[in-house]
Each structure stands twice: as structure tokens, then as C-alpha cells.
A protein has these predicted regions:
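Short glycine-/small-residue-rich Rossmann-like dinucleotide-binding loops
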Residues: 46
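SAM cofactor-binding core of SAM-dependent methyltransferases
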Residues: 1-28
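N-terminal Rossmann-like NAD(P) cofactor-binding module of classical short-chain dehydrogenase/reductase
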Residues: 42
Length: 197
């Protein structure tokens, strides 16, 4: 188990809570092919650029743009695993999780374009040149899924932390991609509208 973090306080928290955690440093300086293989990559790019309370710089903003680094690492890790001779369900990481604010549903031009790009970039980990359409002129739904053949699924759901043991109302989008099957919507218990590519 490893983590990519550069802030001192979060590093100290993980050292206390997960003493065996390996800290690998700044995500922008990592090469996915050199990282120890894992089954899941979890990330939540800083939300200030996507938040309705922020400047709305979107994915092109310096902070929320770290999402692209997460996708790059997943691609590099999966490519390295394939070069080692792994195939199909054995290629790691099998799963990717992304968490962010509901403002991602409306960030970008046209409204919601940033969330469309998030979906498209994750789908492209599995299928390099696919286009994911937006819901325009309607807004993104709070839950949904994408299926690509029989060996890829992606699902998202907006959850409120108050129902998960946190003493505050704090809604977040959780997105899960399964690069080798159709379990993403089961993981999030999603009832949804879906798009089959």
C-alpha cells in the first residue's frame, strides 16, 4: 500500500493510522511503471477549481488538473503490467476511484463539460479513442454508469457524508471504474441512467 501526498499534515495522519503506508511523493514526478502494482488507485483531486464556491477554473486549473495525473499513473501501471505478460482480469490496477465535489457536474463550458472529460479520460484508459457524449442540454444526473463491452464499467453516485457517520452535510461524487468487468455499479449500489458505448 502506498500514497502520493506532499502536504505534511496528511502524511502524518497516514503514518499514525496506517504505519505500513509507503509515501512515494509528488504525483507529478512519479512514473507508474516503477510503482508497486496495486488493485485500486483512489484519488480526490483538490476541489477548489470545480467547486461552485471556488473560481471555477475547472480541470484546466492547477489544482483540479491533478486528476489527469491520476489517470496517467493508472495508464502507466496497466501498460507496465501488460508488458510483464499479464492480461485481462490480471492487469492492475483493476479499479480506479475518484472523489470530488458535486460542482464537477456543472463545471466547464458547456456546463458540465469537465465531468464529461473526467468520464472520457477514465474510459480511454481501457479504450484509447472513445468519445463520451455529455447529457446536453440537460444536467448530469446524480448517479449513472457507462458500460463498454463486457469487460469495462464505470459508475458514479453523489453521496452525503451525514449518512456515513460524519457530523456534517457534505455531498461528494464518488466514481468507480472497473477495467475488467461490470462491478462498478454494484460497488456503489447505483440506480441510474446508463450509457452503453
Amino acid at each position: 500500500m502506498w500514497a502520493s501526498e506532499i502536504e505534511a499534515f496528511p502524511i502524518e495522519v497516514t503514518k499514525q493510522r496506517f504505519p505500513s503506508m509507503i509515501h512515494v511523493g509528488d504525483i507529478t514526478k512519479l512514473n507508474g511503471a516503477e510503482l508497486p502494482p496495486v488493485d485500486i488507485i483512489c484519488g480526490g483531486s483538490p476541489c477548489q477549481d470545480l467547486s461552485v464556491a471556488g473560481a471555477r477554473a475547472g480541470l484546466s486549473g492547477a489544482r483540479s488538473g491533478l486528476f489527469m495525473e491520476q489517470v496517467r499513473l493508472v495508464k502507466e501501471m496497466r501498460n507496465a503490467d501488460e508488458q510483464r505478460g499479464r492480461a485481462g482480469h490480471a492487469v492492475r490496477p483493476r479499479y480506479m476511484l475518484w472523489e470530488n465535489v458535486p460542482g464537477a457536474f456543472s463545471s466547464g463550458t458547456p456546463k458540465g463539460e469537465d465531468f464529461r472529460i473526467v468520464l472520457e479520460e477514465i474510459v480511454r484508459v481501457k479504450c484509447g479513442s472513445v468519445y463520451v457524449p455529455g447529457p446536453y442540454p440537460w444536467p448530469w444526473q446524480s448517479a449513472g454508469r457507462i458500460l463498454l463491452g463486457t469487460d469495462f464499467s464505470l459508475a458514479w453516485r453523489c453521496l452525503d457524508a451525514q449518512y456515513w457517520g460524519v457530523a456534517q452535510r457534505r455531498k461528494r461524487i464518488f466514481l468507480v471504474a472497473d477495467f475488467a468487468g461490470r462491478t462498478a455499479d454494484k460497488i456503489l449500489s447505483v440506480s441510474y441512467t446508463h450509457l452503453t458505448l
